[in-house]
């Protein structure tokens, strides 16, 4: 294992982004999948990949226009020119708007990212996993069997902090443990739209356990509201 790029933190496998130098859990939540890489993950974290792509697009804008002018001399390119110019104008207009609305975009990204990550403590997360017997709440996979591929070898990785309701809270009340496979499969589907009898991993017992976990927080909130009103 390359200690400069990979290491174990708190018992779980982490990877260092070569761009921003941040140590992040080596999962597809933080890195894009790249099959040709030995660990199956991009060398840059997702945030840096998007940043580099934007910088490249802005840097090469003039070169794109020059190549377009050369192609305009070819037969049948007049109509293609109209479509391409329209596309570039839209992109340029979008870039101008982005430059004028940096603060608005920053706030939007913060709000978007806030709904991607859970704001829970390590203790809360461990209690959550303990409640589900350290198994994926959807398929029942044991955490010791939850592994990712690195240099041809499977090594243990932590479960994903799954948003049951993607538009719901970012705290422990909307969090359950999910393996990589179930997390990817569920994506943005509504909970019971995805987790039902048509799902090969469905279990009525696991469904009941998930609902019991979520309901305990609903009851706590209701009790708190009742005491406040009282």
Curated annotation (Swiss-Prot):
UniProt domain HNH: residue ranges: 136-188
Stored InterPro entries: HNH (IPR002711), HNH_nuc (IPR003615)
Pfam families: HNH (PF01844)
Enzyme Commission code: 3.1.-.-
Enzyme class: hydrolase
UniProt GO MF annotations: endonuclease activity; nucleic acid binding; zinc ion binding
Family, per entry: Belongs to the HNH nuclease family.
Protein name: SPbeta prophage-derived putative HNH endonuclease YoqL
Organism the protein comes from: Bacillus subtilis (strain 168)
Lineage of producing organism: Bacteria, Bacillati, Bacillota, Bacilli, Bacillales
